[in-house]
Each structure stands twice: as structure tokens, then as C-alpha cells.
């Protein structure tokens, strides 16, 4: 069965398992043809609701590979930009995360994704998309002081409009770019971390205190 056919039947729990299985074939067996096909399929029939399972499944494969081997995906990053405009959030959150994983290797394309991140923050559609967007901003802002200046206003906006349980990812993103912020910006991040250092959630406490140790 072809990759396209497998992804066409890609739904529910099968979707997650299939994405992981295909990604492992790329990572462990160097089946780069799978990766290249999934990059193309991440924006397949972008306006068609019926094709959303194909797009989201392909995007998941690309995300898993990009996390482990960003250099394999970075040269093709421009082909993934159209996937940031598709209707289903599953595809968008996977690909905005890919943009972060590959940002330091193909910054010119990753910078183009900022416009999409801005839209996602203005209209937050669930925790997965919001958190992936936050982490993208952190990854991009971690590259340089100049890049941090581009993304920090958006991260501030995301903090101000945070949704339930988003704080962990906002803290992680803030930690990533903290060293590239000026003193006043760092003070804002520290104030945000102080709000969460005594959270009832241990993971949140750890992330907050990780930032506070930088002061």
C-alpha cells in the first residue's frame, strides 16, 4: 500500500500510530522518499475537508522527523508554508512546530511563519496549536538578539491571552529566548515565572524556577 493510500485511511488512534511508524522508517531506515512525500502531502488539496486526514497524518510524520533530524527537513521548509493555512489545527500545529525545529537551519523561511503565528495567537484554537506556536516563537527567538526582538512582542501577547494549561509552554518558550532579551524584557519574563513558581503542578513549578534561576 502506498504512503498516500495509508494516509487516506488515517483516522483516530490509527492516525497517531501510523505517523509514528512512518517516521521511524525515515529515521531508522533512511527512507527519505517517505519524508519527501509527506512534505508534499502536508498541504495536499489544502481547501478540501475530505483530505484533512491525509494532511494531518503527513504533517505528523514530518514533525517527528524534524524533531530528531531537523537537517533533513530544513532544505524543504518552504514547501511546508502552505500547510500553515489549512483548515484543520492538527496540521497547523505540527508544521508550526517543524518551523521551530528547523529555524536555526533555515531562518529565512522560519521568519515567514511569524505571520501565521500572529494569527494563531490572535485567535487561539485550543492548547495544542497555542503551545506549538509558543514553542516556535521560543525556538526562533533563541537564535539571536535580533530574532528575539521580532518574536517577543508576540510571546507577550500570548502570555496576556493565555488559555487554560498554556503556562507550561509559555514558560518553556520564555526560557529558550531569555538570554537574548534586554533587561526590561527579562524582568517581564521573571515576573511571569514568579506567578507560577508555586503552582500545584510540579512540571509548572520546575519550568518557572528554571527561569528564576537565570536572574
Residues covered by each model-derived region:
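Amphipathic alpha-helical scaffolding segments comprising HEAT/armadillo-like alpha-solenoid repeats
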Residues: 1-5, 29-43, 70-83, 107-121, ...
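N-terminal alpha-helical scaffold/docking segments in eukaryotic complex subunits
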Residues: 1-68, 198, 202-215
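Structural detector for tandem alpha-solenoid helical repeats, activating at a conserved register
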Residues: 17, 33, 53, 75, ...
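Hydrophobic, well-structured mid-protein blocks that either form specific transmembrane helices
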Residues: 84-132
